[in-house]
Amino acid sequence: MTGDGEAWRLVHVAAGYAVAGVIVFRIFWGVAGTRYARFTSFLFSPRSVFAYLGELLKSKPGHWVGHNPAGSYAIYILILLGLATTVSGFAVYAEIGGEWVEDAHDVLSYTMLGMVCFHVLGVVVSSLAHHENLVRSMLDGYKQGKSEEAIESSKSRWVIAPVVSAVLASLLVFIS
């Protein structure tokens, strides 16, 4: 992407900063967010992931109000890939590490793209299997479940405001 001129290089760098901002936000939200957004709510063993995938292949997957076991692993992998990709991208931009860092950045970015596709496919399959719109649930916070599984009104959104503001301010400083 950056070989096509300076304008595309700036777009690439801005996209890298945006990915870094999203990763920082998700890590913070995974600690201070709502009940099902917290990392502690979706710690699953590899055995439970394979069991869930087996159930899914048999068209009888268990229903999860929060993240299902396969989706939870996808989130952890995407966060790690996002961190590695942005760190390697910053190193390439700062000309630290040489050609192997560029190669690593390329491999990481394509691996992350593949994982994003896998995750989106998982969301579609899970949405169809459970007859629910998971994308809408991610955006509005509403999902099918029992009343005791509901999230009470969260004060977390007020905690997250400074983080979002800092990320947006950083992007504005970079753009100007």
Q: Where do the language-model regions lie?
A:
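Membrane-embedded alpha-helical bundles that constitute the cytochrome b-like, heme-associated redox core
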Residues: 1-176
